[in-house]
């Protein structure tokens, strides 16, 4: 079985064919050191990799950080991929996987394949993982693709070669921007910032939550950001009601900073005829990008499901 995986720092996004159907799965990344306790019917996911013990935990404030580029080659990345496979509904078996690297890692300074990083990623994902009292998948082959670029394949196929698409992929940790010619005849330019992503917002909001007596995991912080306009949700999940206003201000201010930095990057690109915005951070920045690029509406695209846009492209490439 061949499985297409966008192994981002915040979530693992998967797509595969099964029983004649295309299926998808999203698995948040949230791991801590040590094993979780067993109780009742609940089954903890307790893993061992490189002789170290880890467990999956969505709520602990002690979860290990994933918002750095070295995560791409870390034991946590391997665990995240295996955990997504194990929670996908697929029976453990031998699989081939297609994964991604941020543009700044996939390409070198001359915009050529960084073969050392690509091989490093492959070797990392081939490491053995064990699950306490359970079976795991055997990864028999790893293919590595760049982020951003594959997501534009559907749009580029319908454009003539004289046109070009600016593909803006904002993830949890990285911003990947590529300029691709119609029909995928050329990749004109790539840019990757490994320190610019939604985690900029997550970090600042987490600090505001700590001041509101609400220590929690990055997953729960991200859920607060997503539900920032839902007063009932905020009241239910922030321990100090008097601090809700401060948390909302922190969310708004950090999103504004994120938008400004993304627009600074986009301003350096010229000559594109179409724009496509993808990635988990797309809902936070798409409107600002639309206004900034001032391109006609029928040439500006936000993926219907921004988180899954890249795996759709990976599957289309094969």
Residue positions per predicted region:
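Nucleotide/phosphate-binding catalytic cleft detector across ATP-hydrolyzing
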Residues: 1-167, 184-199, 219, 223-318
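Extended, H/D-rich, highly charged conserved domains that either
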Residues: 171, 200-201
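A structural feature that tracks compact, well-ordered secondary-structure segments
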Residues: 176-178
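A cytosolic small-molecule/anion-sensing beta-strand core signal
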Residues: 181
């Amino acid at each position: 079985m061949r499985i297409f995986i966008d192994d981002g720092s915040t979530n693992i996004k998967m797509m595969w064919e099964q029983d004649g159907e295309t299926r998808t799965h999203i698995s948040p990344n949230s791991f801590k050191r040590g094993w979780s306790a067993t109780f009742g019917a609940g089954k903890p996911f307790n893993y061992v990799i490189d002789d170290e013990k880890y467990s999956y935990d969505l709520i602990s404030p002690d979860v290990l950080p994933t918002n750095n580029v070295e995560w791409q080659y870390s034991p946590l990345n391997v665990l995240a991929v295996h955990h997504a496979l194990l929670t996908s509904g697929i029976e453990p078996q031998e699989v081939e996987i297609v994964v991604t690297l941020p543009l700044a890692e996939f390409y070198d300074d001359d915009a050529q394949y960084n073969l050392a990083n690509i091989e490093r990623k492959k070797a990392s994902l081939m490491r053995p993982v064990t699950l306490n009292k359970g079976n795991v998948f055997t990864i028999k082959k790893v293919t590595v693709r760049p982020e951003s670029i594959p997501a534009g394949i559907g749009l580029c196929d319908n454009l003539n070669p004289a046109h070009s698409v600016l593909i803006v992929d904002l993830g949890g940790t990285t911003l990947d921007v590529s300029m691709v010619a119609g029909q995928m005849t050329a990749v004109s330019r790539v840019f990757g910032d490994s320190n610019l992503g939604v985690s900029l917002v997550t970090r600042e909001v987490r600090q505001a939550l700590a001041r509101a007596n609400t220590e929690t995991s990055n997953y729960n912080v991200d859920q607060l950001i997503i539900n920032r306009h839902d007063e009932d949700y905020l009241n239910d999940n922030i321990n100090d009601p008097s601090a809700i206003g401060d948390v909302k201000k922190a969310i708004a201010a950090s999103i504004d900073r994120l938008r400004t930095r993304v627009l600074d990057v986009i301003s350096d690109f010229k000559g594109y005829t179409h724009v496509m915005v993808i990635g988990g951070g797309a809902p936070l920045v798409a409107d600002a990008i639309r206004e900034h690029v001032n391109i006609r509406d029928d040439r500006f695209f936000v993926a219907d499901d921004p988180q899954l846009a890249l795996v759709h492209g990976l599957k289309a490439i094969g």
